[in-house]
Amino acid sequence: MNVHESHPRRDRDLENITLEALTVPWRLQFRVDEALYAVNPNGWTCYIEERDQRCLRVTNNCVISLLKSDLKRRYQTCTLNIGIRVAVPQNYVVILAKLTDPDPTSRGIPIIQVANGLIDSGYRGSIRAVLFFEKSCIIPKNGLAIRLSLVKLASPNLNTRVLFNLSDITPHLECGPDFSTSIETAVRLGSGETKPLLPPSGGGIWAGTGCRALACLYNDRVCKASHYTSSDKNIAFVVRYNDSTSVLGLKDFPTAEDETFVRFYTSGQFATLIPFFETFTPKRTEDAAYDIAAPGDIRLGALSSTTIMIQQRYVCMDDSVIPCIFGRSSMNLRGLIIIPSRWLPNSWLTITICNLTEMTVMIRCGDRIAQLLLVDHESATLIPPTNDTTGMFPTVGKCRRPGASVGEPKWRETLEFDTEAYSSERQFSGFGSTGI
């Protein structure tokens, strides 16, 4: 083939293009997804860490004075503008944490606590850290170091549900005995038929289940499956009773016109016991995390803490998703700290709230108290490796070199942030993951 010869068909096509069409300007729009940052040199120094280019280290290059205005309070809270603006792709989040200082007192550095924070991909304002300190103090030059880690988010199918054994979940449910009794009764009344069953008591709800009807599936292949999906939102749960029988919980009694299709299969992917969005609030595209609402009223005494359990659990056998719990910036400013932690598989969702104020605090049912972050396994080295529920303000140490990764974005500094950073819906509103 002679590459220098004109293709006859192409020549004929070109002849059909009119002169007017050739004069129409061609408009090409494009965007490059990058991890951009801009730094205000007046007060702060920022550089990319050599061991892991997903990490930015920010240090103060001038003295910072912190004044405790309320001497009656044990902890003073304030926000500190660290002079950095970032723009990252929508499938990433920036996690803010203080770097560990092995011996701060020998260098005359006061003990300052920094709340972990999440910065959404759509936020374009200056990043602010929430600080806690017990007395007025002066932070010397280079006395405060903060890391901004570029963390990849996971995108699992959130409609996937998991089958759990009745014996595994009943001991942990608040309604355990009633739930178990209802399932056993339904299996006995089902008599080998798959049909919706009303509670024998006639009370309208099967005790402990929140369901108006239960249906038994007498099929050993279903019982061998691990996951299921269904577009029918009437399905509250599917529980494996034994090796040959599973029970579906139906929120309302189905009518003759209703058709329910359930796909059962075996997988190692992320799946929840209860519908995901019955526990977590849907988020915008630019948001990193899913809000978690208080399951009931919570009363927190002064300088106290409490741990609450939310009836939701998950499995992820392939370890592709690492669910993490973080606090909210608005809660931090009120002196209410959510201890950052990993949500462990096959465990109920537990959240520890600490009240660092001298006042009793009431949290109402439905108030947003925490956030769920679904982290991709490739970013596992950038989050706490264990489920430490004792440290309110986790710090990060020396970077560990990541394994070989292809296509991971790296930080790039820009002097034209407003021009190069792609537009976002949120822009400058609030700070943290969901704003104040």
UniProtKB/Swiss-Prot annotation:
Substrate binds at R328, S329, S330, F431, G432. SUPFAM superfamilies: dUTPase-like. The keyword Transit peptide does not apply. It catalyses: dUTP + H2O = dUMP + diphosphate + H(+). GO terms for molecular function: dUTP diphosphatase activity; metal ion binding. It is an enzyme of class 3 (hydrolase). Its EC number is 3.6.1.23. This is Deoxyuridine 5'-triphosphate nucleotidohydrolase. The gene is DUT.
